[in-house]
Amino acid sequence: MSYQALYRVFRPQRFEDVVGQEHITKTLQNALLQKKFSHAYLFSGPRGTGKTSAAKIFAKAVNCEHAPVDEPCNECAACKGITNGSISDVIEIDAASNNGVDEIRDIRDKVKFAPSAVTYKVYIIDEVHMLSIGAFNALLKTLEEPPEHCIFILATTEPHKIPLTIISRCQRFDFKRITSQAIVGRMNKIVDAEQLQVEEGSLEIIASAADGGMRDALSLLDQAISFSGDILKVEDALLITGAVSQLYIGKLAKSLHDKNVSDALETLNELLQQGKDPAKLIEDMIFYFRDMLLYKTAPGLEGVLEKVKVDETFRELSEQIPAQALYEMIDILNKSHQEMKWTNHPRIFFEVAVVKICQTSHQSAADLPEVDMLMKKIQQLEQEVERLKTTGIKAAAESPKKEAPRVPKGGKSNYKAPVGRIHEILKEATRPDLDLLRNSWGKLLAHLKQQNKVSHAALLNDSEPVAAGSAAFVLKFKYEIHCKMVAEDNNGVRTNLEQILESMLGKRMDLIGVPEAQWGKIREEFLEDHQQENEGSNEPAEEDPLIAEAKKLVGADLIEIKD
């Protein structure tokens, strides 16, 4: 058979031909020049990244007649013999089919013999992770102390399956996936050498489908050339790789953003009718939104985009779709992609994901009016406060001239505090309970912010705990309307506050609200009643009961006694 596949014809023959592995080739070249190469190497990495090719190039370089050199000359008898496989001293073994103990024992017995044609005998064991445990054990001693004329190069795609005793005896080099840009650059050289005509963008599609493997890319290129004929077109590359045009993906993405379920399902059906794989299609959508998110957050990093070519349509769509919507779409598509692995009907999961994204977008949009409604309520409260300032505060301004604060006379009170209940709390109130509550108040407000309870936090801005017992506390409000809303449990505010306090303090405490204008009178009445009770008692009082009760409520450090 005269024809050879492109990946065989253009297999790297020098280190400079190995694409995307400069960190490895540079290290090996320096070791060759300084004659400090090891007796055993482990090359690990994804398929098609150059592990076996680098091993054969290294074998040629150490045995080149012009050694020490950093590149094989490919002209001497040793280099040519290793390239065409005629030199028996460079042995390439497939561990997948030679994984038994007997095969490794055969290597162990023959390794002691000196090479016949070149300086070093090189064993290249491909897919070494396929060896059995017994075979690895048989290789241990030879790998640790091989003869001076012998070099082992182990190659694997799954290094985690190799025993640590083997890995510790080798110099390990990890081959990385080749970038799409590097693959395209290599394919451009190949099509120029083959004098092939390719349409702009077709090589990028093939490189993207290769998933970082140069051999996969060249195999796809070979297939696409055979299919296309004279000119390799973008449509041919899309058809061969099973990829989807960015035009279709952008159209589907726009339908999802516009919440147009009908157009989205129609576009999806059109793509599936063309024979596109649902799993591959949903993966392309995930990468499309991923690239859009990166471009949106860091426009200068176009080099990190995997699948997308930044055009005018992509730019416009990235400006229209908010980042939060991209997060949600990526999350939904990723979950559906995982679920596709366990079903015989992947199309259904894709269609459900499309409908769910559109509905989620509707729900996200519906959340905005709720925020607007809360903001309107806050504005209404602020307007009510301003109205109270103009109608009620003027009358209250005269209260400092009186002996005790009174309820404003500017109008009838809409809320009357539960005096009896407040008196009961004051009888049981203690300073430690009040201090505990006040110290926890900041955490309570922070918790409300985490809950997104904007209206609840607004009600507590001008409130203050003034008395607390073991099972209830009194909360003073600057504005009567705030006190009334809490007492009536509007929007569940009182219930929510009591639940938060219970989770923080470990005990339930009932909230009793009192307006600031009424609090002074209620407290004064309680102190007077308590003083009369103490005066009617037969027990002598060592301290003025009024002062004692005041100390109990607000603390002795805040009391100043004047004769």
UniProtKB/Swiss-Prot annotation:
Component of the DNA clamp loading complex consisting of tau(3):delta(1):delta'(1). The DNA polymerase III holoenzyme complex contains at least 10 different subunits organized into 3 functionally essential subassemblies: the Pol III core, the beta sliding clamp processivity factor and the clamp-loading complex. The Pol III core (subunits alpha, epsilon and theta) contains the polymerase and the 3'-5' exonuclease proofreading activities. The polymerase is tethered to the template via the dimeric beta sliding clamp processivity factor. GO terms for cellular component: cytoplasm; DNA polymerase III complex; nucleoid. This is DNA polymerase III subunit tau. It catalyses: DNA(n) + a 2'-deoxyribonucleoside 5'-triphosphate = DNA(n+1) + diphosphate. Unlike E.coli this gene does not also produce the shortened gamma protein; there is no defined order for DNA clamp loading complex assembly. It comes from Bacillus subtilis (strain 168). ATP binds at residues 45-52. It holds the Pfam family DNAX_ATPase_lid.
